[in-house]
Swiss-Prot record:
The active site is at residues 272, 276, 475. Its EC number is 3.4.14.9. Activated by autocatalytic proteolytical processing upon acidification. N-glycosylation is required for processing and activity. Disulfide bonds join 111-122, 365-526, 522-537. It catalyses: Release of an N-terminal tripeptide from a polypeptide, but also has endopeptidase activity. The keyword Disulfide bond applies. It comes from the Eukaryota. It is an enzyme of class 3 (hydrolase). Binds 1 Ca(2+) ion per subunit. It comes from Pan troglodytes (Chimpanzee). It is found in: Lysosome; Melanosome. This is Tripeptidyl-peptidase 1. Glycans are attached at residues 210, 222, 286, 313, 443.
Length: 563
């Protein structure tokens, strides 16, 4: 009886709206371009909400990531298990008890957690959700390239002040699914003699980055790689098989994925999903490949959060993950960004190599108080991921040196300070670059990205059984670099060494060894009189357009094989 009275009292406090606070006051709630409101949602309709519970020992987790990722540390390569991570960050008993009582009082019944117990996903009716989260008002929206339907609130939500120490944020209210940034460029005109290639294929990738027909997985090691797909993006096995028939004849490969985690729909294949799978499996050839499919098919789901929760619920995971997802930093609440950054830190502690596309808007641009500034993207700006930029061939039809792909995302975070591992490289760039934009356009003390790059221009992809040319974007360069790292992991595992894990501390210590330095070109930015559409420019060593450069496989293997 005492517990029931306590719960009723807590729920009464919630309903009154007294002593409440907003966990995400800075979350942007303007409707993204391409989305349309369809009006209020039915009060009896059900939706799922994800509650991010406050974790413990995050600072200690950060220290452990540094220890297991730094080659000079005696702990290098001694990664944590999922169970180790869970023991470290699991919310306190008080947090678990308080949140569970609160949800029970609100009528939430269908809830499930993850092994780390720091996420809780519950199904509620719209009526219950609006009572639970005062201020929220759920509407239907449709948008995106596949006419996706979502339920979101255009208004901020409140939580009882008593929950402030226990809940970071509630997912499924504000953030819209990201749209694909892939571009299909016009076919360049061939002039003069016939070129050596008519678009980027696996054979072009392998020739440029010095991969021989023998540089494939053994098929016997405990090695695997993965890509993640969102927003109703699916691949088809038949497309993968046709792609390998067309372009995989000169190297051993696998023609099907080993495992799909999540929901793999039966709709039309998406170009981005097809690209991710086909080039991860041709660069990292003959290596077991997983696909994480988090399409966000239910209207209340946030696909990226779903993927993070899948990582927190699997003990045995692929060693390399490539992700072509990103949002503008300024479009996300600080609570959301900081918590997602902790999730990426958890993955790094477990020895996972996470590669994120740097984006396809150059330095980006937005207006702050009437003045233009560059616009960094997240998670590309996280200090716990390896971010991949994009390049083009200097001569479009010749396998030659690379230059900047002008769309390649890059810049400096407005949220995360510069990590110590890149202090020397970034300081050198800022002090020596002859073409720096005005200092008012970027945060010179922020985490700088990308870290590396690969070709991002003019790919061939098979989608819905149709070969499609001239697909471009860092969504292409990211799986290519990921596949090459998987080949290096293959050698490390077969020689009794741990996989590479979080790569950045080692990458910056080696000052670009094993990479082709890209020194020509600039990327795009604000179209104004001051910068005239030009962002940062590449140069010798690290730069915020192509990072340390593109992979030279034999040299990179030699550099990363030991210890």
């Amino acid at each position: 009886m005492g517990l029931q009275a306590c719960l009723l009292g807590l729920f009464a406090l919630i309903l009154s709206g007294k002593c409440s606070y907003s966990p995400e006051p800075d979350q942007r709630r303007t409707l993204p371009p391409g989305w349309v409101s369809l009006g209020r949602a039915d009060p009896e309709e059900e939706l799922s909400l994800t509650f991010a519970l406050r974790q413990q020992n995050v600072e200690r987790l950060s220290e452990l990531v540094q220890a297991v990722s730094d080659p000079s540390s005696p702990q290098y390569g001694k990664y944590l298990t999922l169970e180790n991570v869970a023991d470290l960050v699991r919310p306190s008993p008080l947090t678990l008890r308080t949140v569970q009582k609160w949800l029970l009082a609100a009528g939430a019944r269908k809830c499930h957690s993850v092994i780390t117990q720091d996420f809780l996903t519950c199904w509620l009716s719209i009526r219950q959700a609006e009572l639970l989260l005062p201020g929220a008002e759920f509407h239907h929206y449709v948008g995106g390239p596949t006419e996706t339907h979502v339920v979101r609130s255009p208004h901020p939500y409140q939580l009882p002040q008593a929950l402030a120490p226990h809940v970071d944020f509630v997912g499924g209210l504000h953030r819209f699914p990201p749209t694909s940034s892939l571009r299909q460029r016009p076919e360049p005109q061939v002039t003069g003699t016939v070129g050596l290639h008519l678009g980027v294929t696996p054979s072009v990738i392998r020739k440029r980055y010095n991969l021989t027909s023998q540089d494939v997985g053994s098929g016997t090691s405990n090695n695997s790689q993965a890509c993640a797909q969102f927003l109703e993006q699916y691949f088809h096995d038949s497309d993968l098989a046709q792609f390998m028939r067309l372009f995989g004849g000169n190297f051993a490969h696998q023609a099907s994925v080993a495992r799909v985690v999540g929901q793999q729909g039966r709709g039309r294949a998406g170009i981005e999903a097809s690209l991710d799978v086909q080039y991860l499996m041709s660069a990292g050839a003959n290596i077991s490949t997983w696909v994480y499919s988090s399409p966000g098919r239910h209207e209340g789901q946030e696909p990226f959060l779903q993927w993070l929760m899948l990582l927190s619920n699997e003990s045995a995971l692929p060693h390399v993950h490539t992700v072509s997802y990103g949002d503008d930093e300024d479009s996300l609440s600080s609570a959301y960004i900081q918590r997602v950054n902790t999730e990426l830190m958890k993955a790094a502690a477990r020895g996972l190599t996470l590669l994120f596309a740097s984006g396809d808007s150059g330095a980006g641009c937005w207006s702050v108080s009437g003045r233009h500034q560059f616009r960094p993207t997240f998670p590309a700006s996280s200090p716990y991921v390896t971010t991949v930029g994009g390049t083009s061939f200097q001569e479009p039809f010749l396998i030659t040196n690379e230059i900047v792909d002008y769309i390649s995302g890059g810049g400096f975070s407005n949220v995360f300070p510069r990590p110590s591992y890149q202090e020397e490289a970034v300081t050198k760039f800022l002090s020596s670059s002859p073409h720096l934009p005005p200092s008012s356009y970027f945060n010179a003390s922020g985490r700088a990205y990308p870290d590396v790059a690969a070709l991002s221009d003019g790919y061939w992809v098979v989608s819905n059984r149709v070969p499609i040319p001239w697909v471009s974007g860092t969504s292409a360069s990211t799986p290519v670099f990921g596949g090459i790292l998987s080949l290096i992991n293959e050698h490390r595992i077969l020689s009794g060494r741990p996989p590479l894990g979080f790569l950045n501390p080692r990458l910056y210590q080696q000052h670009g060894a094993g990479l082709f330095d890209v020194t020509r070109g600039c990327h795009e930015s604000c179209l104004d009189e001051e910068v005239e559409g030009q962002g940062f420019c590449s140069g010798p060593g690290w730069d915020p357009v192509t990072g340390w450069g593109t992979p030279n496989f034999p040299a990179l293997l030699k550099t990363l094989l030991n210890p």
